[in-house]
A protein has these predicted regions:
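Local cysteine-cluster metal-coordination motifs and their immediate loop/turn environment
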Residues: 21-33, 55-65, 871-884, 903-923
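N-terminal export/assembly segments and adjacent metallocofactor-ligating motifs
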Residues: 1-257, 265, 269, 273, ...
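C-terminal accessory/binding modules appended to enzymatic or scaffolding proteins
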Residues: 599-621, 797, 861-900
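C-terminal catalytic lobe of FAD-dependent flavoproteins
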Residues: 760-856
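Immediate flanking context of iron-sulfur cluster ligation sites
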Residues: 12-22, 40-57, 861-872, 891-910
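Long, contiguous, secondary-structure-rich segments that constitute the structural scaffold
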Residues: 491, 497-553, 621-637, 641-797, ...
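N-terminal leader/propeptide and maturation segments of large enzyme subunits in energy/redox metabolism
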Residues: 86-93, 255-293, 370-371, 375-382, ...
């Protein structure tokens, strides 16, 4: 093809592509994206420069969104048609929508007739659009008459909701992203913002570059990448946040750093709070929190003296049995110093999901009603009943997330309908969750992805649309509503979540002979219009908004009442709060330790949190191989002191055991926490790490976590558990890795899942970039049955005469290698795995192996002489490894090392998520071998 012809083809191809604006479906920052499609598939994605949440930036996850929508993966992962089974233990079979929904309506009607409306429950998700949320809420509370509807936002945001309501009067974050640019002090607590909200963190970095006087304090049990960037780092002990905030307020009182005029004019309850915090002296608080008095006093002074202090916080405060108190204590500090209701200041809760805010707006929690109304308020119930055209709304709060599954296990709830969430991965005490799902008379799962752990328990699977196919609205952390438009049509027989709920509701109404429908909607816009009307006169009034305004003027913040020309950036600038008195309320917050104390049997504080390039249970990010390159396999991170005390080296397997369950994991050395603490990424469920356990399998990180919850917010303490860690003596081990056709990738993972439960320990992850591969690892007390090993190898194509084989049965070692086109295609090692590192790198680098000759099969760990390990990938966007970064630093003569790396290797110049880690590597001493050279 000539150059001119190729150019013409490219122009025609570009013409065939269309671009539409949408929103990223990951965290609560709510980044705008521009999606490129050829009409059949998503072919690219980039940040929307006009969206006020991100101004064109995307993180590693957002910039690879299009890769999650590849047709080859969609065909393997997506639920594309309804499925049902009538006998547990059998496979589900394909069914029509009519047959499926008729069956569900009849079962619900029969169960409700026999046991009452509270015998059914709905567990929904912060990944639903607001319209989906609204319809399900109305279905449960309005049509069926049960408040047993809760959302996975209970696991992440309900303590923030309760904290805002107790102190400020409404669940309304008072600050906005612009306040990052205007702050004099940023106080980050309970959040690794650099990982969890990376685009917001880019804004923090920019603000600090523009204003060198801007200070940043970080309080966290771990020295995260966020903490390493801080001007002052407070390495508090797990769960001591309330003591820290009370101690800071004590110092502000002692040093006259409170704003008494604001307190007198706009708050109430301060005298009682003073009596609470008077005992939180610097000495007591420093000892409680495990920090120095000097740092505590410095933090309090910076906060109290600042013209504008902005607090950013997330799950470290919320996921706690005292999460509401943590939120309230921090808000107390803001109120007392008048760090609220003005530019650059305020307590700003960062949401973890793309529409957790939207779910709160429609009353998606079991104790709330539409438009921030309270279920316990008779007037609020009457208002909702009038809006919906029903006699009344049930007055008794429904079961919260943990309570719902406990009731399911006890038999009080007979049917559960799970929508767009994966409780068999994300809920605490997985043993109880699975017992509940097995005990249920009927489990309905409404999902886009059939690969989640929860889908294994589904008696009925309802296929739903997902990102790029949905239409509606989402609300991000700063109260900004974005219109979400479909980029592609619905695949297969999928329906929008609200459509499924409405079709079911119409059938139930017919069975109950209702004279008129509560669900007369023909479009998502009609649903949203009713939601909009529910907000009239409320703190989140959006009666001035419409789909048309969102379409023409772009994303808008609430409140946006009728007659307004714009939303409100920040709240309470007039000092008036949505309470009965119009004043904010100080709440007494005595410190309570973690729910589960460490002791001689369980001496470690286990914390959980996010990895940089993964999200939640990984049903979406887990389909993109390159997102595994930064943290390639499940692991528990321990301090160097604890590794040495237990005679552990990196990669050694350990039993991690709590009072509820156990999981074997590789141990890694970390320099980000003190002795006696451990960390596991929250994402690792049984889809990626498992084992035989007691015969029923092991369930990943949340086999360990506690279901104990905050009495006000009902949010469980997922952030902390007491565990013991013992070396796992598993003498037999195996690893298999190889390239897999993309059309078989996820199917292979699913096929390997049952095999994982046959070993004491097993994990299965992806690797690669342009090509994708699967890595399967296992270990056991004894050598695995040869038939099982052969079966696993055959799934990687390691079978037949073309396989190179070395077997030493006496020592239990084997090396089986599949070569194609002169390059490694797949490798299986058992027994001695010491050659894994270089064999895998040869495979990933697609290097010719002819010159290696016998070395391929020699029982040695030594790599070829010219081999050089790339090490871990640091910059995912541009595929830059730690070794390459350290080599460049070794040759650097001086000056700005970060600028040099960005210019020479381009790392940190795309999404910027790796910049905090680049700074960490720059500051760290070079490896000894490099220094010696």
């Amino acid at each position: 093809m000539s150059e001119a012809t190729a150019s013409a083809v490219a122009v025609e191809a570009a013409k065939a592509l269309t671009e539409k604006k949408a929103t990223c479906c990951y965290c609560g920052v709510g980044c705008g994206v521009i999606v490129q499609t050829d009409g059949e598939q998503v072919v690219g994605v980039r940040g929307d420069p006009d969206h006020p949440a991100n101004f064109g930036r995307l993180c590693t996850k957002g910039s690879t969104l299009h890769l999650t929508a590849r047709p080859a993966l969609q065909q393997q992962a997506r639920a594309l048609y309804p499925e049902m089974r009538f006998v547990r233990g059998l496979d589900r079979e394909r069914a029509s929508w009519d047959a499926t929904l008729d069956f569900l309506a009849n079962r619900f009607a029969e169960t409700i007739a026999a046991h009452g409306p509270d015998s059914v429950g709905f567990y929904i998700s912060g990944q639903l659009l607001t319209e989906d949320y609204y319809v399900f809420n109305k279905l449960a509370k309005g049509l069926i008459g049960t408040n047993n509807i809760d959302t996975n936002s209970r696991l992440c945001m309900s303590s923030a909701v309760a904290g805002y309501k107790q102190t400020l009067g409404a669940d309304a974050p008072p600050a906005c992203y612009e306040d990052v640019d205007l702050a004099d002090l940023i106080f980050i607590v309970g959040s690794n913002t650099a990982y969890a909200h990376p685009i917001l963190y880019r804004r923090i970095e920019e603000a600090r570059r523009r204003n060198p006087q801007l200070k940043m304090i970080v309080a966290d049990p771990r020295r995260t990448d966020t903490a390493r960037d801080a001007d002052l780092f407070l390495p508090i002990l797990p769960g001591t946040d309330v003591a820290l905030f009370n101690g800071m307020l004590h110092i502000c009182l002692w040093e006259d750093l409170v704003d008494q005029a604001f307190i007198d004019a706009h708050t109430e309850g301060f005298a009682e709070l003073k009596r609470t915090v008077r005992d939180y002296t610097p000495q007591v608080v420093a000892e409680t929190c495990g920090i120095s008095e000097q740092d505590l006093v410095q933090a309090a002074r910076w906060f109290g003296e600042s013209k504008a202090a902005l607090s950013l916080y997330c799950q470290g405060l919320n996921q706690s049995a005292s999460g509401t108190a943590k939120n309230a204590a921090l808000i107390n500090l803001h109120l007392a110093t008048h760090q609220i209701g003005k530019p650059g200041a305020g307590p700003f809760s960062l949401t973890g999901q793309p529409n957790a805010m939207g779910g709160r707006e429609v009353g998606g929690l079991s104790n709330l009603l539409s438009a921030h109304r309270d279920m316990g308020n008779p007037q609020h119930r009457a208002e909702v009943a009038r809006l919906w055209g029903i006699e009344d709304v049930p007055a008794t709060p429904g079961k919260s997330a943990v309570e719902m599954f406990e009731a399911l296990r006890a038999g009080d709830i007979k049917i559960i309908w799970i929508v767009c969430t994966n409780p068999a991965q994300s809920m605490p005490e997985q043993k109880m969750i699975r017992e509940a799902l097995k005990k249920a008379e009927l489990v309905v799962v409404q999902e886009a992805y059939k690969t989640t752990a929860t889908c294994e328990f589904a008696d009925v699977l309802l296929p739903a649309t997902t990102w790029s196919e949905k239409e509606g609205t989402v609300t991000n952390s700063e109260r900004r509503i974005t219109r979400f438009r479909p980029v592609l049509g619905k695949p297969g027989e999928t329906l929008h979540d609200w459509e499924i709920a409405i079709r079911f509701a119409h059938r139930l109404e017919k069975l109950w002979q209702r004279p008129r429908t509560l669900f007369p909607y023909a479009s998502a816009e009609e649903v949203w219009n009713e939601h909009r009307e529910s907000t009239r006169g409320r703190d989140l009034d959006i009666t001035g908004l419409s789909y048309e305004i969102l379409e023409k003027q772009g994303p808008q913040q609430w409140p946006y009442p009728q007659g307004a020309s714009a939303g409100r950036k920040r709240l309470y600038e007039d000092g008036v709060f949505p309470t009965a008195s119009g004043r904010a309320k100080f709440v007494g917050t005595p410190y309570q330790p973690v729910a589960e104390k460490v002791d001689a049997r369980y001496p470690f504080h286990l914390t959980t949190g996010r990895l940089r390039d993964q999200w939640h249970g990984m049903s979406r990010t887990g389909t993109v191989a390159q997102l595994f390159s930064h943290a390639s396999e499940p692991a528990i991170v321990l301090s160097q002191v604890d590794m040495q005390r237990r005679l552990l080296k990196d990669g050694d397997l350990v039993h991690v055991t709590s009072r509820r369950g156990s999981q074997i994991l590789p141990a890694l050395t970390g320099d980000d926490m003190r002795a006696g603490q451990a960390f596991i990424g929250m994402h690792w469920g049984e889809e990626y790490v498992s084992g035989r356990g007691n015969g029923e399998g092991t369930f990943g990180v949340n086999a360990l976590t506690t279901p104990v919850f905050d009495p006000s917010s009902r949010q469980p303490e997922l952030k902390h558990a007491a565990v013991k860690i013992l070396k796992a003596e598993l003498p037999w081990s195996m690893v298999v890795f190889g390239w897999i056709p993309e059309s078989q990738l996820l199917s292979l993972q699913a096929a390997l899942r049952p095999a994982m439960r046959k070993f004491a320990y097993a994990s299965c992850t992806l690797f690669g970039r342009d090509r994708v591969g699967v890595l399967f690892r296992a270990a056991d007390d004894y050598a695995a049955d040869k038939k099982l090993v052969d079966e696993i190898e055959s799934r990687f194509g390691i079978a037949g005469a073309q396989v190179l084989r070395y077997d030493d049965r006496k020592r239990g070692n084997s090396r089986h290698i599949l070569i194609g086109d002169g390059k490694l295609q797949a490798v299986s090692l058992t027994g001695d795995l010491s050659a894994e590192h270089w064999l895998k790198q040869y495979l990933e680098g697609e290097q010719p192996v002819a010159k290696l000759g016998r070395l391929l099969l020699m029982p040695t760990a030594d790599p070829p002489q010219d081999f050089k390990s790339r090490g871990r990938i640091v910059c995912n966007c541009l595929n830059v490894s730690e070794t390459e970064i350290r080599d460049a630093l070794g040759e650097h003569a001086g000056g700005d090392a970060l600028a040099m790396l960005q210019q020479k290797l381009k790392c940190g110049t795309s999404c910027g998520s790796c910049v905090p880690e680049l700074k960490k590597i720059i500051l760290a001493p070079q490896p000894q071998e490099k220094a010696a050279a």
